[in-house]
């Protein structure tokens, strides 16, 4: 995984973001509601778009649009009516864009609940859209994807544009012309569809504004026809040849305004000669444009938002799904193709509450920390090579004891997380002396940081070590497993659970072939109560107070005070041991995704059904005893899972010394195995939390999204609709005038969105062309 180091000194990765909800889903990935962990913006809520690199790379044009979105967001940062970018980073398999969370949700949702807007409400939205689009054009950007789903309302009711994946950014010296056939077909202008030889300009966005204006005032789409064919080709033909079927009852000025925006002849279109044409139209005469630019117009629609995590104005089909970080394959040359993607907003650069702030990297560090007991005793290696690791709460660096030059690793934690560091130190002190547990040598504290000085381990992590071996046998795997089981048993005997057992937390003391392993990172370890009464009491406390396991895959319930949390005990550690053993012997992670299209929910289902097998060439030479042990550890029911006593007495651990047949693991172990392992562990923890009762994937298919959203409306606390007459969209008949009905009840078989591709408003598949 790539951690992003900005010139100002900050790194961000998935460990800095806890997944809370799913906000949207599309062809290339998902949009999550996330909480920031650590740093100056600790606990801030954001929206994170996560894209799979393998899917982005399916088309050259899609790759170009993805990279362009990141550039456009940086260029537009700080613009009032546009969603702000805060971070962009990548892993080996995915791209991440972290933006502000606009809690009022999609304009689409609000229009669905009302049927259509009155003139005052529509005029307000249109005015702010004019300002927003003009701000794009002033910055040399064509939006190209203005539609209801990409218009958000903030908590005050002001407009925010999102999703700039199809935007075109013109660089200095470039002609302000584009050529791509891209966007959502019912919002495309004739010149985008026809693509004249000279390309098209930003005037295409004013056409899309005309479509939006029509939809706001009628609840209907101007170029779709009920009872007729509504393929992309059919819609495109109507855009090119048909007149807009205005209702006879539409306001005269509104009709003229929309008609001029939807003028097929480019030179006659409103906005062709500049934005002032639009601002000066009679329909917009009541707008104070200075106030509009300053966001001081009084919003007509103000969303009623209950709390920071309120997602009522986003599709329930997505928000009801578990927020799982699904596995993905790593494409070849990904780092080269996506170089320069990363970004951290200047407004969130860490200060003194960073896990390790800029103050430790300053030239005058000795003067700054003259009173620090750590710096009086140790010299910190501030070079790139001295950085050994980084998490959400800490960094690990190489250090040298001043008196004798002895080398150590120091875990440095901000005083903001001093209580967690002190707890980790106490647990480490309790488990000292075991040969397979990292040794704690010293503990220090100063006004800025908490320091855990530990032995330095120069060997590799478990899977990396195996990957580098030319020959790896079942006997050697058993030796590793014996050491690991010994360490975990030592913890459990002291009523301690590790809660984060995974290959990257298993390191070796050196690169020597006979080196012993060490279990490291006790940041999420906890003491178990000694009696059932204490245990029940402790579970209640833990449910309210303690986040646990690897935070980049942590569930929202584990991070939110007052929410429920899985009941962790020794059984979770034992299950993790089973996954480690399976991976060592086969080079594969059990329950892992069988295809790139597979969801994390499906992984959870396989975990709950214990669906793993010993088929394939990798298992040919693996002993029956090893398979028996894995089966016992990966048993779903914790009451039937192998106990620690049964594990230590198992035949395989006692009699595997003679099994010298080479395993295929070193040659087939993928580079993404660590990430896949973590995703599998997180899926298990989700399932464990829910008592292994899973959401049926068929209950929320993507194809139902439009139908669900059309039926959205105000609901009471029980979830029942307050209005039995559900508002639905309808399509106007082609080539004739249609009367507007005053009734909000519309035929259930009609809907302006029925024809659309089932793509999210924030992530979609785009059509490519030879030029951008």
Curated annotation (Swiss-Prot):
Signal peptide: none annotated. One of its GO terms (biological process) is regulation of DNA-templated transcription. Residues 17-284, 382-653 form the Protein kinase domain. InterPro entries: AGC-kinase_C, Kinase-like_dom_sf, Pkinase_C, Prot_kinase_dom, Protein_kinase_ATP_BS, Ribosomal_S6_kinase_II, Ser/Thr_kinase_AS. Its EC number is 2.7.11.1. Residues 285-353 form the AGC-kinase C-terminal domain. GO terms for molecular function: ATP binding; magnesium ion binding; protein serine kinase activity; protein serine/threonine kinase activity. The active site is at residues 145, 500. It catalyses: L-seryl-[protein] + ATP = O-phospho-L-seryl-[protein] + ADP + H(+); L-threonyl-[protein] + ATP = O-phospho-L-threonyl-[protein] + ADP + H(+). Its cofactor is Mg(2+). Transmembrane segments: none annotated. It is an enzyme of class 2 (transferase). Residues 706-772 are annotated as: Disordered. Activated by multiple phosphorylations on threonine and serine residues. Residues 718-727, 739-748 have a biased composition (Polar residues). Enzyme activity requires the presence of both kinase domains. Serine/threonine kinase that may play a role in mediating the mitogen- and stress-induced effects on transcription. May repress transcription via phosphorylation of 'Ser-1' of histone H2A. May phosphorylate histone H3. Belongs to the protein kinase superfamily. AGC Ser/Thr protein kinase family. S6 kinase subfamily. This is Putative ribosomal protein S6 kinase alpha-2. It comes from Caenorhabditis elegans. The lineage of its organism: Eukaryota, Metazoa, Ecdysozoa, Nematoda, Chromadorea.
